[in-house]
Amino acid sequence: MLSKRIIPCLDVKDGVVVKGVQFRNHEVMGGIVELARRYASEGADELVFYDITASSDERVVDKSWVSRVAEVIDIPFCVAGGIKSVEDARQILEFGADKVSINSPALADPTLITRLAERFGVQCVVVGIDSYFDAQSGHYQVKQFTGDESRTRTTAWHTLDWVEEAQKRGAGEIVLNVMNQDGMRQGYDLEQLKLVRAVCKVPLIASGGAGAMEHFRDAFTLADVDGALAASVFHKGLIPIPELKRWLKTEGVAIRE
């Protein structure tokens, strides 16, 4: 059985790590390199960095900190933010990232997923999906440009359809960001994760809503996700990673020490 992954998520804006609630009202959490070093030493399995305004600002992720992070940690890390071309991805991978994640640019040009997968291998290509439950329609919809409230828009894609399309085009991993739950610390959206799991044949990472150790366990055992991503509970020290991993092990979850 493959070990489940615990993945701190670091949203980057203006050169520092920030965290909002439902993608709004961001507050500063700390320095990029300092937090990366801390999480690596605490036993995180992987890190994900989102330059949250890169796509909405129409620029690519700032690479200066990517190489600094690569120098100080020895765990895999993934970088996202405005990656629109094979060349953008090549530079980020050359600076030391292990994976690139694409979100809004993949929605604008789905062929980007295939081009990246063919050039670097599917194991390097993550597709991030910002999914929002629209209570009026009863559908899970995919949102775009979520780093900037003024530019955020609902796409024509239903979440499950986009998950299937992204896989067909070569996504090696899916990160499902559940916008309704983001920063609320009420638990992952297990119902949506189960629906996505049923159509997702590549590794699936849950994101949005972790607030207690039980939430991680439930995502792993009830929705069968491969990794659980969280931000505020780690940044604010509410759940220490070593403690979380020890507890998950006692709950029967296959976890790396």
UniProtKB/Swiss-Prot annotation:
Keywords: Amino-acid biosynthesis, Cytoplasm, Histidine biosynthesis, Lyase. The keyword Lyase applies. It catalyses: 5-[(5-phospho-1-deoxy-D-ribulos-1-ylimino)methylamino]-1-(5-phospho-beta-D-ribosyl)imidazole-4-carboxamide + L-glutamine = D-erythro-1-(imidazol-4-yl)glycerol 3-phosphate + 5-amino-1-(5-phospho-beta-D-ribosyl)imidazole-4-carboxamide + L-glutamate + H(+). Pfam families: His_biosynth. The active site is at D11, D130. It is found in: Cytoplasm. The keyword Transport does not apply. It comes from the Bacteria. It is an enzyme of class 4 (lyase). Pathway: Amino-acid biosynthesis; L-histidine biosynthesis; L-histidine from 5-phospho-alpha-D-ribose 1-diphosphate: step 5/9. One of its GO terms (cellular component) is cytoplasm. InterPro entries: Aldolase_TIM, His_biosynth, HisF, IGPS_HisA/HisF, RibuloseP-bd_barrel. Its EC number is 4.3.2.10. CDD domains: HisF. GO terms for molecular function: imidazoleglycerol-phosphate synthase activity; lyase activity. GO terms for biological process: L-histidine biosynthetic process. Gene3D superfamilies: Aldolase class I (3.20.20.70). SUPFAM superfamilies: Ribulose-phoshate binding barrel (SSF51366). NCBIfam families: hisF. IGPS catalyzes the conversion of PRFAR and glutamine to IGP, AICAR and glutamate. The HisF subunit catalyzes the cyclization activity that produces IGP and AICAR from PRFAR using the ammonia provided by the HisH subunit. Heterodimer of HisH and HisF. Belongs to the HisA/HisF family. This is Imidazole glycerol phosphate synthase subunit HisF. It comes from Aeromonas hydrophila subsp. hydrophila (strain ATCC 7966 / DSM 30187 / BCRC 13018 / CCUG 14551 / JCM 1027 / KCTC 2358 / NCIMB 9240 / NCTC 8049).
